[in-house]
């Protein structure tokens, strides 16, 4: 699979606690990356998501060994692959370790606070299929880009709730590969997100109705591909769980007034969907995630490392 796993055995009698930082980034292979330091920040694509958390997790491992600290429970350090887009690495790890994990901490995201639940995320690719042809051909005078454009305009007029937190995005679209051809396949993607599976379902139905109407209006057919689906990850009562209470206490002990939210979107969701108590947090404040201008503050990382170390000791238990 490609996951890298290290187990620091406890002396016994404590929980099995997983700390996860993902190895992949959203950037394509071949991108030339050179980190630069300016005004107390390090700048490089992927430096925040998720390099800073890999660095912090490795630092805590070295610190535990250097101080010869023993914990009652096992500390399992997992560096996962393919977090971006499909959670493939964490799904494999969780599936292989069913019933063996007590707490799962995904290091990915916020610095001052943490998440205890995950949003639902559904990705689709919608296609309008038409006859195509040359610009001057005798096929209908429009290409599949027409119902595509009309649909996108109407979809963006839908009311997307802000409470509970929900999002809609059309990120990709395509059609003919040349200027002088009518598109025979006009397609676009939709990214739906919400902490409510019911809201995602409602938006799905509204979008499906729009697509059907626009396909009928132009005499074309349509099809939908499901690219990826991940339901909202919520464990009833988890806000008051032992893990969340300990995580909040650790943050407050370090001087944070932590925002505690239910809008996670990372490996933590996979653990939650498997019924494992899980949170996600991060080791340092960063900006411009998923952009070439991504950057992180350097100085706060030291406090972030302390936070992760305290979480490890508080959850696994000191011998």
Protein language model annotation of sequence segments:
Residues 127, 136-139:
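FAD-binding subdomain of flavoenzyme oxidoreductases
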Residues 116, 133-136, 144-319:
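Metal-dependent amide/peptide-bond hydrolase catalytic core
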Residues 24-38, 101, 116-127, 279-280:
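Acidic-glycine-rich active-site phosphate/pyrophosphate-binding loop
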Residues 41-42, 46-123, 161, 170, ...:
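Acidic/histidine-rich catalytic neighborhood of metal-dependent amide-processing enzymes
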Residues 33-46, 129-132, 289-290:
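Glycine/charged-rich beta-loop-alpha catalytic/anionic-binding loops adjacent to active sites
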């Amino acid at each position: 699979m490609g996951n890298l796993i290290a187990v620091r055995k406890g002396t016994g009698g404590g929980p099995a606690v997983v700390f996860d930082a993902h190895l992949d980034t959203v950037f394509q292979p071949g991108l030339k990356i050179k980190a630069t330091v300016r005004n107390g920040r390090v700048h490089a694509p992927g430096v925040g998501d998720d390099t800073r958390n890999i660095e912090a997790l490795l630092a805590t491992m070295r610190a535990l060994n250097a101080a010869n600290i023993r914990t009652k429970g096992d500390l399992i350090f997992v560096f996962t692959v393919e977090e971006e887009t499909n959670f493939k690495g964490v799904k494999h790890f969780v599936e292989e370790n069913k019933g063996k994990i007590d707490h799962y901490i995904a290091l990915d995201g916020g610095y001052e606070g943490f998440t205890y639940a995950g949003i639902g995320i559904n990705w689709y690719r919608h296609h309008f299929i038409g006859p195509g042809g040359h610009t001057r051909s005798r096929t209908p005078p429009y290409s599949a880009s027409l119902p595509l454009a009309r649909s996108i305009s109407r979809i963006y007029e839908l009311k997307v709730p802000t409470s509970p937190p929900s999002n809609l995005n059309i990120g990709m679209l395509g059609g003919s590969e040349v200027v002088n051809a009518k598109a025979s396949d006009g397609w676009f993607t939709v990214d739906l997100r919400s902490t409510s599976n019911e809201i995602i379902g409602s938006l799905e139905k509204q979008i499906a109705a729009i697509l059907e109407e626009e396909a009928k209006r132009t005499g074309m057919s349509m099809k939908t591909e499901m690219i990826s689906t991940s339901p909202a990850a919520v464990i009833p009562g988890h806000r008051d769980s032992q893990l969340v209470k300990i995580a909040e206490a650790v943050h407050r002990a370090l001087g944070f007034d932590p925002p505690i939210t239910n809008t996670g979107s990372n490996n933590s969701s996979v653990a939650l969907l498997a019924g494992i108590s899980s949170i996600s947090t991060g080791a340092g404040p960063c900006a411009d995630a998923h952009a070439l201008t991504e950057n992180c503050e350097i100085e706060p990382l030291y406090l972030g490392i302390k936070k992760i170390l305290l979480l490890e000791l508080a959850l696994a238990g000191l011998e």
